[in-house]
Amino acid sequence: MFNKIAIVADHRGEDFKIVVADALKKINIDYVLPTYDTGAENDYPDVVKSVYKLYKQGKVDGLILLCGTGVGMMIGANKCKGIRCVWANTPDVAALGRIHEDCNALALGVNYLDNNSGYKVSLSKQKIQKIVQTFVTTAFAGGRHARRVEKLNNL
């Protein structure tokens, strides 16, 4: 379980921060919506760099990162020491990221293109909330997974 989670977004995920905050509020998880100056472009690498400072300072122990696909945020977060970020578009993927990899960050893509259909796919507010709630309430399994996480930490 997390003590405090930072919710951040680039320009494409900005409108969904309140959806995530509401999901956390419903299950009594403390959160912060940090302010940061990443310039007019609000590029996701700058957002990740900014929120990582809060994590390093111990002010938060979890991150929820929102952007168009979620992929850029995930890549950026996984470059930060101590962060294990799962990209999830279903509650099951979010849960497995916690159970197997002890992920402390969740990247969500709020809208992206489906390569099969070519149509823009958006996660519903309800689905975002379910993914978030599943992520923060799922425990790490430990055991053999702890050994694997330690190996990841030492890469």
Regions found by a protein language model. Name each.
Residues 3:
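Nucleotide donor/acceptor-binding cores
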Residues 6-15, 91-155:
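C-terminal binding/interaction regions
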Residues 8, 32-35, 63-67:
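Short, conserved beta-strand edge motifs with alternating hydrophobic and charged residues
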Residues 15-26:
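Short, solvent-exposed amphipathic alpha-helices that sit
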Residues 30-42:
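A short beta-strand-loop structural module common to alpha/beta enzyme folds
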Residues 40-53:
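Helix-loop module immediately N-terminal to the HCX5R catalytic loop
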Residues 50-87:
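Helix-adjacent hinge/juxtasegments
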